[in-house]
Regions:
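Nucleic-acid-processing active sites and adjacent nucleic-acid-binding tracks
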Residues: 24-63
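Short, glycine/acidic-enriched loop or turn micro-motifs at the edges of active sites
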Residues: 12, 70, 94
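Acidic, metal-coordinating catalytic cores used for nucleic-acid/nucleotide bond scission
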Residues: 62-75
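Anion (oxyanion) recognition and catalysis
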Residues: 81
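Gly/Thr-rich phosphate-binding beta-strand-loop-beta motif of the actin/hexokinase/Hsp70
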Residues: 2-22, 114
């Protein structure tokens, strides 16, 4: 049981901190607040301040909690992890939904709300663990590649539109040549990133092992494999639970059932990581064409009269369940696999 709950509200240049002293769900003292810079010296001052205001409570009874804000939250979380403190990084929407109606909006109020959330839900806390250095680097390369690809697509579309809509002129020629040059340079950048990704995977035993297993499935290419690895911490983030991974991808169907009038068939929820969901869709389409196990499963469902979009979502689910089981058991894909419909 924890007795000291430290809520942290992250921002670019500072963190706002609130401390709640509690015995169970009862607060035993007034809340205290402060703010610190997002630097190593600022983090050290934060720890010193908490120690001074801890009323003698042992560090093992402390629980830091904050919203997952990506890079903004990474610095302090890694610092606390390195010092041996318990840090809970929670989804921002979970905190907001559980905290009810709040009229006051400020950094200090947000830190207080987070500390209160930690106090009331500490039994559900999942302690923060950073990605391994190799996996963290792989994640950065993957995200950078996605950004470059988006820019390339933007220039390709813009150049195509101008070619179709503008009359022939020196300006049109300049735009076309410039766009072609930029797209060419971006293609070179993507090639360099892909080469670096391949080198990084080969340099790490665990990465190459998981990568080899995932890409042994026909239809799963390099980008989908890397995407799964970096977003699931090599499938450990969800403890190899394929249902949770499917939910994270936004392909797990949920129904609505209430009273006598609300009854709807299960549907996928809009809350999902849409970027990786789109990538999995491409993998599912490729698997239907090139993976005999998935192709047979797809045709069975289509012959039963199911809509093709529903069947495609089922294929995505089967791929996630299949790949997760393979990684958990450290087994390569076999064409002898049998999938029940």
């Amino acid at each position: 049981m924890k007795n000291l709950f430290i809520g942290v509200d992250f921002s670019k240049e500072k963190v706002d901190v609130a401390i709640i002293f509690a015995d169970g769900l009862a607060e035993t003292a007034s809340r205290v607040f402060n703010e610190f810079k997002t630097t190593v010296s600022g983090y050290k001052q934060l720890i010193k301040w908490v120690e001074q205001n801890s009323s003698g409570i042992e560090p093992s009874l402390w629980l830091f909690c904050g919203e997952n804000t990506g890079d903004y939250s990474k610095g302090l979380c890694n610092f606390l992890y390195g010092k041996g403190y318990d840090m809970w990084l929670e989804n921002a929407k979970s905190i907001k939904d559980a905290s009810g109606l709040r009229r006051l909006k400020s950094d200090r109020a947000a830190a207080s709300m987070i500390a209160e959330y930690a106090m009331r839900n500490y039994d559900k806390a999942i302690m923060y663990e950073p990605l391994s250095e190799s996996l963290a680097q792989l994640r950065e390369l993957f995200l950078y590649r996605q950004m470059v690809v988006r820019h390339r697509c933007s220039f390709q579309v813009r150049r195509g539109e101008k070619r179709l809509t503008m009359e022939k002129s020196p300006i049109k020629t300049m735009i076309s040549q410039s766009g072609r040059h930029i797209v060419s340079e971006l293609n070179k950048e993507i090639e360099k990133i892909d080469k670096r990704i391949a080198e990084l995977i080969k340099s790490d035993e665990e990465l190459i092992e998981v990568y080899t297993i995932v890409t042994s499935v026909p239809g799963i290419g390099t980008q989908n494999a890397v995407c799964m690895m970096v977003y699931t911490d090599n499938f450990r983030r969800f403890n190899y639970d394929s249902r949770k991974i499917a939910c994270y991808y936004g392909i797990a169907p949920f129904g609505k059932d209430s009273g006598t009038s609300v009854h709807s068939d299960p549907r996928v929820h809009y809350m999902a990581n849409r970027q990786i969901k789109a990538m999995l869709t491409q993998a599912a389409l490729a698997a239907v064409n090139f993976n005999p196990v998935i192709a047979r499963y797809y045709m069975r469902l289509v012959e039963r009269g199911k809509k093709k979009q529903v069947v495609l979502n089922n294929v995505k689910n089967k791929l996630i369940h299949l790949i997760t089981a393979m990684v958990r058991n450290r087994q390569l894909f076999s064409p002898e696999y049998k999938i029940s419909a």
